[in-house]
């Protein structure tokens, strides 16, 4: 069941989203060769709790950390450890923040030091595909209008969208209905309505869209070992169009 949010609830999510956007901006400054993924997790959790909120992911389904940190061919759900980021890596950081009972969810992919032109393009196209998608995030459009726009843009640029994992509704729970795929034919799925809040999150692979899960039960990697990027924001569907709740310029 899709749960519509009223103006007050969206305002609460806006506040959670602001903390999350600021967290990701801080992490962007901290990403550098030599820093461990555990240190990034510590920085994020400290910043979130200092602002009176809690990390949404820690303990969710038994997840052990505040951040999902996925490096290079890792797609999503990597968890922090002793790995030191290296020059040329790309790192996807996915984070959630809960404030006053409402969640926000967002992800960014950053280059570490000097990265290849192809890796830069992958990160850029992944981010741009999100913004292409939300051009369709208007009342009375269909959910897969967003999905199709993302897929068309990604594939036109020579990359592929992950199909085994999708975006989702969000609110009092991190994961709510509906599922928000990044692929599919337009004109399908539920009609978009004012009060929907969606976590829209293109996951884009340099090679095949196929993925697999490692033996740790969490970390999802590309099946062909090629790079993957992830970009996500929490988006409210309002009567006059979409509002991104987790993007702080």
From Swiss-Prot:
UniProt keyword annotation of Protease present: yes
Residues the entry annotates as binding a divalent metal cation 1: 94, 105, 232
Single GO cellular component term: cytosol
GO terms for biological process, alphabetical: proteolysis
EC numbers: 3.4.11.18
Enzyme class: hydrolase
Chain positions recorded as a divalent metal cation 2 binding sites: 105, 168, 201, 232
Alphabetic keyword roster: Aminopeptidase, Hydrolase, Metal-binding, Protease
Annotated PROSITE patterns: MAP_1 (PS00680)
Catalytic activity from the UniProt record: Release of N-terminal amino acids, preferentially methionine, from peptides and arylamides
Domain of life: Bacteria
Entries under InterPro entries matching the protein: Creatinase/aminopeptidase-like, Pept_M24, Pept_M24_MAP, Pept_M24A_MAP1
Cofactor annotation remark: Binds 2 divalent metal cations per subunit. Has a high-affinity and a low affinity metal-binding site. The true nature of the physiological cofactor is under debate. The enzyme is active with cobalt, zinc, manganese or divalent iron ions. Most likely, methionine aminopeptidases function as mononuclear Fe(2+)-metalloproteases under physiological conditions, and the catalytically relevant metal-binding site has been assigned to the histidine-containing high-affinity site.
SUPFAM superfamilies on file: Creatinase/aminopeptidase (SSF55920)
Pfam families registered for this protein in UniProt: Peptidase_M24
Function: Removes the N-terminal methionine from nascent proteins. The N-terminal methionine is often cleaved when the second residue in the primary sequence is small and uncharged (Met-Ala-, Cys, Gly, Pro, Ser, Thr, or Val). Requires deformylation of the N(alpha)-formylated initiator methionine before it can be hydrolyzed.
PANTHER family in the record: METHIONINE AMINOPEPTIDASE
Subunit architecture: Monomer.
HAMAP family in the record: MetAP_1
Family label: Belongs to the peptidase M24A family. Methionine aminopeptidase type 1 subfamily.
Name of this chain's protein: Methionine aminopeptidase
Organism phylogeny: Bacteria, Bacillati, Bacillota, Clostridia, Eubacteriales
Gene symbol of the encoding locus: map
């Amino acid at each position: 069941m899709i749960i519509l949010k009223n103006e007050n609830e969206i305002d609460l999510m806006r506040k959670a989203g602001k903390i999350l956007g600021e967290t990701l901006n801080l992490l962007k400054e901290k990403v550098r060769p030599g820093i461990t993924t555990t240190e990034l997790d510590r920085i994020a959790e400290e910043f979130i709790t200092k602002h009176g909120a809690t990390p949404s992911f820690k303990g969710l389904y038994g997840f052990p950390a505040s951040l999902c940190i996925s490096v290079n061919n890792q797609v999503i759900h990597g968890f922090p450890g002793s790995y030191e980021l290296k020059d040329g890596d790309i790192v996807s950081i996915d984070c959630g923040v809960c404030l006053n009972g409402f969640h926000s969810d967002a992800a960014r992919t950053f280059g570490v030091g000097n990265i290849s032109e192809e890796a830069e393009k992958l990160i850029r196209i992944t981010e741009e595909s999100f913004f292409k998608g939300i051009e369709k995030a208007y009342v009375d459009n269909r959910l897969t209008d967003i999905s199709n726009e993302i897929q068309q843009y990604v594939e036109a640029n020579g990359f592929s969208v992950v199909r085994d994992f999708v975006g989702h509704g969000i609110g009092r729970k991190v994961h709510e209905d509906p599922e928000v795929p990044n692929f599919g034919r337009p004109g399908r799925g539920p009609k978009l309505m004012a009060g929907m809040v969606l976590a829209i999150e293109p996951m884009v692979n340099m090679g095949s869209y196929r993925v697999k899960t490692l033996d740790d039960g969490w970390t999802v990697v590309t099946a062909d070992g090629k790079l993957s990027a992830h970009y996500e924001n929490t988006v409210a569907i309002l009567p006059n169009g979409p509002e991104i709740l987790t993007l702080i310029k």
